[in-house]
Regions:
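Aromatic-rich peripheral "rim/lid" segments of glycoside hydrolase catalytic domains that contact
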Residues: 28-39, 45, 314-335, 339-430
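Substrate-binding cleft of extracellular glycoside hydrolase catalytic domains
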Residues: 34, 89, 94-205, 303
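Conserved, mostly hydrophobic/aromatic
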Residues: 84, 164, 238, 303-305, ...
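Catalytic domains of carbohydrate-active enzymes, especially glycoside hydrolases
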Residues: 68-93
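Boundary/entry segment of secreted carbohydrate-active catalytic domains
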Residues: 25-72, 82
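Noncatalytic carbohydrate-binding groove/subsite architecture in carbohydrate-active enzymes
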Residues: 140, 171-303, 309, 313
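C-terminal motif of bacterial Sec signal peptides marking the signal peptidase cleavage site
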Residues: 15-18
Length: 430
């Protein structure tokens, strides 16, 4: 009898310890999720990054609904994306705040759902987007409210918002409608950093600005000003943009087919052009790195934007640089992911879905066609393999199942692919 009591006691003790350990494991798992920070996420290939706009109509007046955003988030999550970049928190454009709501709802529905956000705060100069001449030496009075809203959302969603990006291409001088001087970006970055120190923002929230490589010192000397040096010191990391696609028109020296390659098969000419495109992006990345190190600074540098359009009736189309099609997009996407994942660089690939508001009066304008998915939810060539793997099974966009463009017919796709111009042809145009 006593022996039986002892056995029961021992078994009960084992059960209690087991339950206790299980509870500890569950608590530990929960704590790990809560404690994920920007430092953990950035540069981690387990957290693929992407630029995201969920707009489906020709005007941003038509805001995507929460259910539509949740559709998109499920699609992106299925392909391994866990870090989104948004661009503004303007009062009339609740897209970003709705994305945060949608993520929170999905997390409540599924404890394993994981998605984080680099929240953009839009920065303008005085008179931007008006009929008055932009004053690039004075900032817009709207900037203060934009920063306040971004900070408020970071506090409301500390489990989701891990980064605030002050401005989008807000310092680069070709943004003639709205660019500001580096001192404006520095002012707001310092303000947010001060809020962190005062305990008014999460201490692990990272602050940056997302801008062209040249704005981060990788280009001409006109950008090498004291306020940029201070900005490099002030941010937690650098978020730089690089676009070989656009430079196939504006700086095409790398793009043309060399004389020595003229007798190669067209497929080889295209593949080698895309290898040069990757090297172009890497060179711009290295130029920002070199500038940063010349200041005695050593911080992470990640790619806040890069992408490749699939339709263009302008500079990049059949009568231009002939850079535009899904095949080239596929080669670029794969090579960028491969390089950045191996190098420990986050790449906010631009972008998730086509958005037709970007060039609303020109349906075939390249800005409308940077997505990895069409508006209808068709997967473009770069991610056909994911469709084959079945990761989108059961998911829809606008009632459409996720299928391949061109009905998955690569031969049909290749009919739309053009070889880049020769070096001689490019030089003759310049």
């Amino acid at each position: 009898m006593k022996k039986g009591v002892v056995i029961i006691f021992v078994l009960s003790l084992v059960f209690m310890v087991s339950c206790s350990e299980k509870k500890k494991d569950e608590m530990s798992s929960t704590q790990i999720k809560k404690e994920v920070t920007a430092k953990d996420i950035l540069g981690n290939p387990q957290y693929l990054a992407i630029s995201y706009g969920g707009y489906r109509e020709r005007s941003r007046d038509s805001q995507p609904t929460i259910p539509e955003l949740k559709e998109d988030l499920k699609i992106l999550s299925a392909m391994g994306v866990k870090l989104l970049r948004t661009y503004n928190v303007q009062p009339k454009l609740p897209h970003a705040s709705n994305v945060l709501k949608a993520i929170r709802e999905l997390k409540a529905e599924d404890a394993d759902f994981e998605m984080y956000v680099m929240l953009g705060a839009w920065i303008d100069c005085l008179n931007a987007w008006t009929d008055k001449a932009p004053n690039h030496d004075v900032e817009s009075p709207n900037n203060e409210g934009e920063i306040e809203r971004a900070a408020a959302l970071a506090n409301e969603y500390p489990d989701i918002v891990k980064i605030i990006a002050v401005g989008n291409e807000a310092m680069v001088k070709w943004a003639t409608s709205y660019y500001v001087q580096p001192e404006v970006i520095l002012k707001w970055v310092n303000h947010l950093q001060d809020l962190k120190k005062e305990g008014k923002l999460p201490k692990d929230l990272w602050i940056t600005s997302s801008d062209d490589f040249s704005s981060w010192g990788g280009g001409s000397a006109e950008y090498h000003v004291e306020d940029l040096e201070k900005l490099v010191e002030a941010v937690d990391f650098i978020s730089m943009h690089t676009y070989p696609y656009h430079n196939s028109h504006y700086n095409p020296e790398f793009w043309g087919v060399p004389e020595a390659h003229k007798d190669m098969p067209d497929s080889t000419k295209i593949e080698m052009a895309m290898e040069r495109a990757l090297k172009f992006a890497q060179k711009q990345y290295d130029s920002v790195t070199n500038y940063m190190k010349s200041l005695g600074v050593n911080k992470p540098i990640h790619i806040g934007e890069t992408g490749w359009a699939t339709i263009s009736n302008g500079h990049y189309g059949n009568n231009g640089s002939r850079a535009t099609d899904e095949y080239k997009q596929g080669l670029y996407y794969k090579s960028m992911r491969r390089w950045t994942n191996m190098a420990g660089i986050s790449c906010f690939y631009f972008e998730a879905f086509n958005e037709k508001w970007k060039d609303a009066h020109n349906a075939k304008g390249s800005e409308n066609h940077f997505g990895l998915f069409t508006i209808e939810g068709k997967a473009k060539y770069p991610i056909w393999d994911l469709v084959d793997q079945g990761i989108f099974d059961g998911l829809t966009r606008g009632g459409n199942t996720i299928t391949k463009t061109y009905n998955g017919d690569k031969a049909l796709l290749l009919e739309d692919v053009l070889v880049p111009p020769s070096e001689e042809e490019i030089m003759a145009r310049r």
